[in-house]
Each structure stands twice: as C-alpha cells, then as structure tokens.
Regions:
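Cytosolic, long alpha-helical scaffolding segments
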Residues: 1-146
Length: 146
C-alpha cells in the first residue's frame, strides 16, 4: 500500500486536457462570432473586426500549445494519446481557418460578403455552439459512448 502511494506520487498528474478542449470550443464560438462580425462590417470597420478575430486566434493558439505540452507531460491520458493530439490540431485548425477568411477576401479583392457567405458564417457559429455542448462530455467518455 505504501509502495503504491509512493509510485503514484512520482507519476505525472493528469493535465487539464479536457478543460482545455472546452476552452478551445469557447474560443471557436468567439471566433465564429467575430467572423460573422467581419462579414457584416462596413469596409472601414473590417480592419478592427479582423484584428479582434486575430486576437482570438492568438489566444486559442496559446491554449492549443498548452494542451500539446500537457499531453507530452501526462503519463495516463483520458483516451488515446494520438486521438487527443488529433483533436488539439483539429480545434486549432477551425480557428486558424476562420482567421484566414478576411486575409483571403482582401487578397482576392472581395469587398463585401454576400448572403450565402453570411449564412455559412451563421452555420459555422451554430456548429461551434454545439462543440461547447459536447466537449464537457469527454470527462466521462465511457458513460457517453452510447
């Protein structure tokens, strides 16, 4: 019993990986709202709103890097290590892609976003909201498998 306690005390503690997924999901929601704001903005307001989206992306990158470092320090993970890394990357990619929209629009000379593009941004926002609902379910992944 004493030996088991000693071994456990030396093992790395589980990092807050799931909490970081939840935090990333919240960043995705915020980024999707910022993307919508960019799309409805007048051209003279677009720079400020694009900068806000960039700030969200930078903060989300910080969380993704922390999650990656935490994964490498963790001995026992809540589920497969490669799946955790893939999820970290996928969540980060969501925000990175949203962040690229204003830059690519400017590159291709798109001055305004038409209704279908704005609708697509709304779909992205609604899907992002779903992420904030499902990420906490990862804390009890086996109970929620069905």
């Amino acid at each position: 019993m004493l030996l088991l306690r000693a071994i456990r005390s030396m093992m790395p503690k589980e990092e807050r990986i799931i909490e970081q997924f939840v935090e990333q999901a919240r960043h995705i929601v915020t980024a999707s709202e910022a993307l919508e704001a960019v799309m409805v903005a007048e051209p003279d307001e677009r720079g400020e709103r694009t900068a806000a989206l960039k700030r969200i992306e930078k903060d989300a990158d910080r969380v993704a890097k922390e999650a990656g470092r935490g994964l490498h320090r963790t001995f026992i993970t809540p589920f497969d290590r490669s799946e955790i890394q893939a999820l970290i990357n996928a969540l980060d990619d969501c925000i990175d892609l949203m962040d690229e929209v204003p830059r690519h629009a400017a590159l291709y000379g798109i001055d305004s976003f038409d209704t279908p593009m704005r609708r697509m941004a709304g779909i992205i926002r609604r899907q992002a909201a779903l992420l904030t609902e499902v990420m906490p379910l990862l804390t009890s992944i086996t109970a929620n498998a069905d």
